[in-house]
Amino acid sequence: METTNFGFVASLLFVGIPTIFLIGLFISTQDGEKSSFYSDSSKGKLGPKR
């Protein structure tokens, strides 16, 4: 019983964490404000180096 429960929790975490990450990434991309802020910080870091 414990092994089955552990397997269920492990699979739930294994599937759930990437799903939550992808949903958060999708929301931040859709938001626009966060996406542009992320792009600005990336350009700011890459710009001065090159």
From Swiss-Prot:
Its main location: membrane. Pfam families: PsbM. It comes from the Bacteria. GO terms for biological process: photosynthesis, light reaction. Keywords: Membrane, Photosynthesis, Photosystem II, Reaction center, Thylakoid, Transmembrane, Transmembrane helix. SUPFAM superfamilies: Photosystem II reaction center protein M, PsbM (SSF161033). It is found in: Cellular thylakoid membrane. The chain crosses the membrane at residues 7-27. It is a single-pass membrane protein. The keyword Transcription regulation does not apply. GO terms for cellular component: photosystem II; plasma membrane-derived thylakoid membrane. The keyword Membrane applies. One of the components of the core complex of photosystem II (PSII). PSII is a light-driven water:plastoquinone oxidoreductase that uses light energy to abstract electrons from H(2)O, generating O(2) and a proton gradient subsequently used for ATP formation. It consists of a core antenna complex that captures photons, and an electron transfer chain that converts photonic excitation into a charge separation. This subunit is found at the monomer-monomer interface. HAMAP family: PSII_PsbM (MF_00438). Belongs to the PsbM family. PSII is composed of 1 copy each of membrane proteins PsbA, PsbB, PsbC, PsbD, PsbE, PsbF, PsbH, PsbI, PsbJ, PsbK, PsbL, PsbM, PsbT, PsbX, PsbY, Psb30/Ycf12, peripheral proteins PsbO, CyanoQ (PsbQ), PsbU, PsbV and a large number of cofactors. It forms dimeric complexes. This is Photosystem II reaction center protein M. It comes from Prochlorococcus marinus subsp. pastoris (strain CCMP1986 / NIES-2087 / MED4). The gene is psbM.
